[in-house]
């Protein structure tokens, strides 16, 4: 009887790790594609069958990994709702883009159906590939960021979640006069992730 909760936790742990890791690569990809940091601040790594660009800047790496580490804990505890990356003008302080990743627990009667299933692993990888490619392709319709920008990451977690002491509350950072585009999604045996980007038409 003890094997059931062990398998459930393994499935949740594996899915939480996969989704948290995806966020790390997705954030890096957005920072590169949107020119938040110069191209020489990134290196190419192979992930999801794709050439991915990740920051080599120690401060950026530390910031992202700290968030991803906390995300993984909240994912495993089933307390995470969404992750948001906001791109802000350094000059005006105006928020210009808002990337939102919604996290939904998959409600399935058989949580063990796809555990260890190679075909399902390939399906998840293909879905992630498609989403990463779509994030890359957003440069074809997103307005060019003419000014220097910075970024912040917001995390929506349940109210009873234990929050790191150096994290602070934030407003939702909803963009005014914005267009919104729904991007692709991917799902594991435990989580479904969908993505959308909002951007200022006339910043």
UniProtKB/Swiss-Prot annotation:
Gene3D superfamilies recorded: HORMA domain
Effect of loss of the gene: Simultaneous disruption of nucleoporin alm1 results in a growth defect.
GO molecular function: anaphase-promoting complex binding
Pfam families in UniProt: HORMA (PF02301)
Domain of life: Eukaryota
Keyword Translocase: no
Role according to the record: Feedback control that prevents cells with incompletely assembled spindles from leaving mitosis. It interacts with the anaphase promoting complex/cyclosome (APC/C) thereby inhibiting APC/C-dependent proteolysis, a step required for exit from mitosis.
Complex and partners: Interacts with mad3 and slp1.
Protein name: Mitotic spindle checkpoint component mad2
Gene: mad2
């Amino acid at each position: 009887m003890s094997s059931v909760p062990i398998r459930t936790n393994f499935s949740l742990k594996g899915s939480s790790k996969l989704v948290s890791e995806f966020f790390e690569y997705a954030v890096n990809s957005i920072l590169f594609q949107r020119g938040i940091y110069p191209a020489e601040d990134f290196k190419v790594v192979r992930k999801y069958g794709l050439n991915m660009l990740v920051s080599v800047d120690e401060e950026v790496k530390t910031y992202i990994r700290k968030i991803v580490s906390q995300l993984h804990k909240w994912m495993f505890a089933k307390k995470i709702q969404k992750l948001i990356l906001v791109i802000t003008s350094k000059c005006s302080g105006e928020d210009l883009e808002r990337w939102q990743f919604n996290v939904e627990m998959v409600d399935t009667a058989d949580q063990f159906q796809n555990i260890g299933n190679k075909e399902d692993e390939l399906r998840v990888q293909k879905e992630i590939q498609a989403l990463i490619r779509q994030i890359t392709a957003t440069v074809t319709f997103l307005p060019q960021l003419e000014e220097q920008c910075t970024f912040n990451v917001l995390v929506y977690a349940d109210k009873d979640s234990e929050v790191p002491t150096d994290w602070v509350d934030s407003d939702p950072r909803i963009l005014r006069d914005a267009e919104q585009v729904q991007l692709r999604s991917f799902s594991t045996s435990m989580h479904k992730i969908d993505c959308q980007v909002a951007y200022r038409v006339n910043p």
